[in-house]
Regions:
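A structural signal for short, hydrophobic/glycine-enriched beta-strand patches
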Residues: 21-145
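N-terminal type II signal-anchor transmembrane helix
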Residues: 1-32
Length: 145
């Protein structure tokens, strides 16, 4: 009986610890730690014939909110063409933001990226060229930077 109790305890303690760590990670992932920056970067996501997917629209809405709070004077939208070569994720983002009141001159489009890694590299080059030192990156919990 003692042995069963020890085995149960040996399994329960790590499980409780793991659940606690997972809860803390989940809690921290919802905290918005944005500080005033030179630019807001919106990572691309799917677009459907010129319309942002729900994921992209959520990112754009958050970028718009940050912009209206004056967290940065510029927004950089990223992402190239997917299945439809007429539209790019970055271009769709620009259109969405201008329709929602962001002046076109405040938006920079990186429309070549076919991956997050490519877009981040391209944005780094844009920021260096424009002497932008800091950025707020808008993404969702499932994207990895």
């Amino acid at each position: 009986m003692k042995r069963i109790l020890w085995v149960a305890l040996a399994l329960l303690v790590p499980a409780v610890y793991l659940a606690q760590v997972a809860g803390q990670i989940q809690k921290q992932s919802t905290v918005d730690e944005a500080q005033i920056a030179d630019a807001i970067i919106v990572l691309g996501a799917a677009e459907y014939r010129g319309r942002p997917s729900p994921v992209l629209e959520a990112r754009l809405n958050h970028a718009l909110w940050l912009y209206l709070k004056k967290m940065a004077p510029r927004i950089i939208t990223t992402g190239g063409a997917g299945g439809d070569p007429v539209f790019t994720e970055g271009g769709v983002g620009r259109g969405y933001l201008t329709r929602h009141g962001v002046p076109p001159e405040a938006i920079i489009v990186e429309g070549e990226g076919d991956s997050t890694a490519y877009s981040v590299t391209a944005v780094g080059e844009i920021m260096e060229r424009m002497n932008l030192q800091s950025a707020i990156v808008v993404r969702d919990r499932k994207s990895v930077v």
